């Protein structure tokens, strides 16, 4: 039986060292009828990180104490000196197993997982799978990518930055690693030209900067301290385009440059787009170090084998935090979603002390759309903030239509006639010849005399979202036709896509609402005068004025959970059974975020050639949290990943800037017209609160051994746990569910009868007395003990929570436990339950 798992979900996170060894050249890859492919092979011997001696804090104690038996129980600490022997053992193993055969080894994985990536055929894969040393063979799979003002919205200038000593040192000494599309090293957001304070030398970092023609010597500096690229899987497949994708850490896409600047970009960088200053940018942790591991590319996305190599290298280099704005196309198959090369490698990264942040995914708002699964990964959803660049269109009938677009206004006090692109065609053009003429992409389709001096109405279709048509091209057409401005109305088929404000170098507006677009067209059509006999158009009577959208206002109710942000419950498997784990962990600003942009990016034509771009998605939310995590790590260097996670979660905000409960968008059609009170399935613990996270009061600790116990509690997981981690599940192991983990939340997918859950908390603040309050989920009675306790610094307190089913619930219901300290600390614990009364 061939032990080969076919896996095709499109996100991956793991780490490896870059070792390219080939027994033949790429020209010898395969014949036309060959079935060769890239496989990720993991071996049963543990990676280097599992050989490390545990260095736990004296006060740290695992809640669970299973009798775990690693294959190698050596207490000796292993470091870089171990790497050559691991790589040599891989080569020796392959030579013996595939003696005389052609194959390409792309990478050796050794730090977080023990294995390699190979380009082989199916017969060779089967031969490898029969070897007792092999744990898993997985087909390589594709992966994809998933501020000026947000630091102010998050309260950093008056809060967290003040606690750190000011923005001048916020995040200093902490290294954030980014697995993304690379970086533009010449961007001012990443220079080290701080004349007042030089950057310290990171003593715990061993990474390097690649030197290539497009990433020359000197690209890195005292802030950007590491940069590598990983593309061997793509190269082996023959799809790597070096002129477009750049065989270097240089960012040809823009996404990686953007995310890095959101987390750790320099403070006070002017955001100038289309010659207009939109403010001054800053990362959340502007003094943090940046190390870049490029594994995604503009033309094809990325592949698991390359991403795995990037993460393994990042861990080996010594990063403190990993930010991953990438998500899967589908849920991992197998026993549980947690058992995939990515999450297993990230579990090893957490064991090594790395805090891992991942985007939730942009597949909301339906339930169970979560793309980040495991409890050791901190999952971030996307929310709005209160800044809005308002633009509007005032019609001749005194109706005002809201819209968007970074555009200048039409002349004050003056109305201009409008003309639809379909009515502006020249005599040689028709819709029959070009069905896309309404998108205003070709100057030669139009009659300049008809358009000159008017507002040209164009259709914004799905082709704009796909990059087949562009705002920039439509504006160029309008200028060549001497139009006064451009109005874009939305095509109904664009529903479900987030549209960001776009720079316009003339008066213009995008109307993102279908209903508002209908209002515009109804007025326009009703104002057309026709000849009574011939029905030919005599004149266009509709007039309008564009207000312009260059100025921001800050009156928006925020935050709101964005409709596209992936939702819980967390799916445990491909049958969509619920895991007893809260996802997302929280939400952070992700909508309409200014960030640095690569000088070579053509990913967004509207921002091509600009130094900044506005983007939306959970990709933008995750680096906000990575930056806050860097601030926490700076204040508490001894904090483990789970402690950082706890500090972020228990301090999250539940109310918006108006003092009301945070709302969530329910649908992508007119999302702000379908708001409802956000639940933990939408926003996790709430909205990130950077200032409070630096002083959480009580923290919840969860160890690597706890996570292993959790994995061992999954039915049929014994062999998988052993193959991935090297730990054997005890024969008499008491099952541990997600709700048993010492997490700052309680999530029960099926609650029947009465169950009691315990949470252990450690006080990292001064002596304090806490009062405990709670609100039970629907269909459940709740009792929490103790209702009051006093605790000294360094002491632990166990909280006992008893839930009893009183009514059936067909879906998740939500409650909350609040701990209120007499010195001001507040600890929030969300409770999510599906209650089931057992049938008699």
From Swiss-Prot:
CDD domains cross-referenced by the UniProt entry: PA_subtilisin_like, Peptidases_S8_3
Bias (Basic residues): 61-81
Domain PA: 418-513
Location of the Peptidase S8 domain: 148-694
Active site positions, chain numbering: 180, 255, 619
Keywords: Autocatalytic cleavage, Glycoprotein, Hydrolase, Protease, Secreted, Serine protease, Signal, Zymogen
Enzyme Commission number: 3.4.21.-
Family: Belongs to the peptidase S8 family.
Name recorded for this polypeptide: Subtilisin-like protease SBT2.3
Native source organism of the sequence: Arabidopsis thaliana
């Amino acid at each position: 039986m061939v032990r080969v798992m076919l896996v095709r979900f499109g996100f991956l996170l793991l780490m490896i060292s870059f070792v390219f060894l080939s027994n033949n050249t790429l020209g010898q890859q395969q014949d036309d009828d060959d079935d060769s492919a890239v496989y990720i092979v993991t071996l049963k011997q543990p990676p280097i990180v599992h050989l490390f001696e545990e260095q736990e804090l004296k006060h740290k104690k695992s809640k669970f104490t299973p009798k775990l038996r690693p294959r190698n129980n050596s207490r000796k600490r292993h470091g870089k000196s171990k790497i050559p022997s691991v790589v040599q053992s891989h080569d020796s193993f392959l030579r013996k197993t595939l003696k005389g055969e052609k194959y390409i080894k792309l990478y050796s994985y050794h730090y977080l997982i023990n294995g390699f990536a190979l380009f082989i055929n199916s017969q060779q894969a089967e031969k490898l799978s029969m070897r007792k040393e092999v744990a898993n063979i997985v087909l390589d799979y594709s992966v994809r990518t998933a501020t000026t003002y947000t630091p102010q919205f998050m309260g950093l200038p008056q809060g967290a930055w003040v606690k750190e000593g000011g923005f001048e040192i916020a995040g200093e000494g902490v290294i954030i690693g980014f697995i993304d599309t690379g970086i533009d090293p010449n961007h001012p957001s990443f220079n080290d030209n701080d004349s007042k304070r030089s950057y310290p030398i990171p003593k715990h970092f061993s990474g390097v900067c690649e030197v290539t023609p497009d990433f020359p010597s000197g690209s890195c500096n005292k802030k950007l301290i590491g940069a590598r690229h990983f593309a061997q899987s793509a190269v082996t497949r023959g799809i790597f385009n070096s002129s477009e994708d750049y065989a270097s850490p240089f960012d040809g896409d823009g996404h990686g440059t953007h995310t890095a600047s959101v987390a750790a970009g320099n403070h006070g960088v002017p955001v100038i787009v289309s010659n207009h200053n939109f403010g001054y940018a800053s990362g959340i942790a502007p003094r943090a170090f940046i190390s870049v591991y490029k594994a995604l590319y503009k033309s094809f996305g990325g592949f698991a084998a390359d991403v795995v190599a990037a993460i393994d290298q990042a861990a080996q280099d010594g990063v403190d935090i990993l930010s991953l704005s990438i998500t899967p196309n589908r849920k991992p198959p197998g026993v549980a979603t947690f058992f995939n090369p990515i999450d297993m490698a990230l579990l090893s990264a957490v064991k090594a002390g790395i805090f891992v942040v991942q985007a939730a995914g942009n597949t909301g708002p339906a339930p169970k759309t979560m793309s980040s699964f495991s409890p050791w990964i901190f999952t971030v959803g996307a929310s709005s903030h209160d800044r809005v660049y308002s633009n509007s269109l005032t019609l001749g009938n005194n109706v005002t239509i809201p819209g968007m677009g970074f555009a200048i206004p039409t002349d004050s006090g003056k109305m201009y006639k409008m003309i639809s692109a379909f009515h502006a065609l020249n005599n040689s053009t028709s819709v029959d010849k070009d069905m896309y003429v309404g998108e205003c992409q070709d100057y030669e389709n139009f009659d300049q005399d008809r358009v000159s001096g008017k507002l040209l109405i164009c259709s914004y279709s799905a082709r704009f979202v796909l990059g087949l048509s562009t705002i920039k091209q439509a504006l160029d057409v309008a200028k060549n036709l001497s139009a006064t401005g451009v109005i874009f109305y939305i095509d109904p088929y664009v529903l479900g896509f987030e549209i960001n404000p776009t720079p316009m170098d003339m008066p213009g507006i995008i109307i993102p609402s279908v209903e508002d677009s209908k209002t515009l067209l109804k007025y326009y059509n009703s104002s057309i005068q026709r000849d009574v006999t011939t029905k030919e158009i005599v004149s266009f009577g509709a007039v309008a004025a564009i207000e312009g959208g260059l100025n921001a206002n800050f009156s928006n109710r925020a935050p709101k959970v964005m409709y596209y942000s992936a939702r819980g419950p967390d799916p445990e498997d491909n049958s969509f059974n619920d895991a007893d784990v809260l996802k997302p962990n929280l939400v952070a600003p992700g909508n309409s975020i200014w960030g640095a942009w690569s000088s070579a990016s053509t990913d967004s034509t509207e921002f091509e050639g600009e130094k900044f771009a506005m983007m939306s998605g959970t990709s933008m939310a995750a680096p906000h949290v990575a930056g806050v995590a860097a601030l926490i790590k700076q204040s508490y260097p001894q904090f483990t990943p789970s402690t950082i996670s706890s500090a972020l979660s228990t301090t999250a905000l539940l109310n918006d800037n108006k003092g009301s409960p945070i709302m969530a968008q329910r649908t992508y059609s007119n999302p702000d017209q379908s708001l409802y009170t956000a639940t933990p399935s939408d926003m996790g613990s709430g909205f990130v609160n950077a200032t409070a996270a630096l002083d959480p009061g009580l923290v919840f600790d969860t160890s690597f051994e706890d996570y292993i116990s959790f994995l061992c509690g999954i039915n049929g997981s014994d062999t998988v746990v052993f193959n991935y981690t090297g730990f054997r599940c005890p024969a008499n192991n008491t099952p541990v569910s997600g709700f048993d983990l010492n997490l700052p939340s309680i999530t029960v997918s099926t609650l029947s009868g009465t169950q009691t859950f315990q949470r252990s908390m450690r006080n990292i603040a001064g002596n304090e007395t806490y009062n405990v309050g709670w609100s039970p989920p629907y269909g459940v009675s709740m009792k929490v003990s103790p209702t009051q306790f006093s605790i000294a610094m360094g002491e632990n307190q166990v909280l006992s929570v008893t839930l009893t089913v009183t009514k059936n619930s067909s879906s998740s219901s939500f409650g909350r436990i609040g701990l209120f300290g007499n010195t001001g600390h507040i600890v929030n614990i969300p409770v999510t339950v599906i209650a089931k009364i057992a049938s008699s």
